[in-house]
Amino acid sequence: MVPTSKRLVGLAVLLGGLFGCATAGTRGQVGGASEGLADPPPRAGDPLVLIAMPPSATFQDVRRSLITEIQRDFNVSTLTVTSSTGMDEIGAAIARLSPSCIVLMNNTTVSLYREYQHAHPDTAKFPPSVVVMASFIDELRPTLINATGIAYEVPGVTAFVDLRSVIKAPVRKVGVVYRPSFRQFIARQKELAEKEQIELVAVEVGKGVYADRLRSSLHALLVEQKVDALWMLNDNELIKSSEYLDQTWRAELRNANVPLVVGVPNLVNPRTPLGSFAVVPDHEALGLQTANLIFELAENGWHAENHAVELPISIKTLADVKQLRAKFGLKDDALQHIDRALE
């Protein structure tokens, strides 16, 4: 049994293309991890947490703080996941290591574990999984057995209110495009936005979002609905590629004087302007929160399915200050509300 005090670690202090073939790693480690992903030396008899993740820097930030908090109570093994990683590699790691819990970072890793579960329907018990750094976990969770996690999406209203505190232009009406599978998510976001006197105007598109359909939907929001801002969901079908972004979002925003709120930091870049403002989880804090969740699951028999998906407890704001200042005006205290100002 993990001490209760461990569950609270870090909480008092605390209150957005992400994907090697398996190669030999350090002791207790699986997958093609670099030296920077070396796992702590294993101890006999301790339960093990398997971390399946892409090797990129943002994921390493989460992993680093997670391991710092759990390594005294758990052995840790890291499986690096890339575009060439297959379901069998996940299965081999589980068979060899018998993990007490699996941390799944990003949607590709979740898909691999789901494939593994579906390919072994007669398995009596799958290791519980904690999903982090993945889009729309509430929608993913029903497709997994014994899973919970921490949402990556910060509620839209949080971003809208933060944007409103930064720019002089009004933020009363925000437009969003979504696919049918996100209907319930959008309904929840509308309710939250109303509490802050912000109207969320939503346009539903088909399951497969063709560029012309997305562009016409964005045009309707900008020209007909005259929204004050646009919100881009963390949905791969709405982003797809740089070329797709050029044909859709950039094409419609080129002549529109509205900010674009995004949910991943790499879309806010003054050198290739697109996203104006982002509110994202603090990755170090996300690792600590993941550790806390693992301790809670350990104390409660690893019943992940009984634990609700959590919201991130610490967030950061990023802004293309050059764009915001030129197009929408910055309030006098704007920089006090921005954690990372880009120009």
Predicted regions and their residues:
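An alpha-beta-alpha
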Residues: 51, 66, 149-196, 303-323
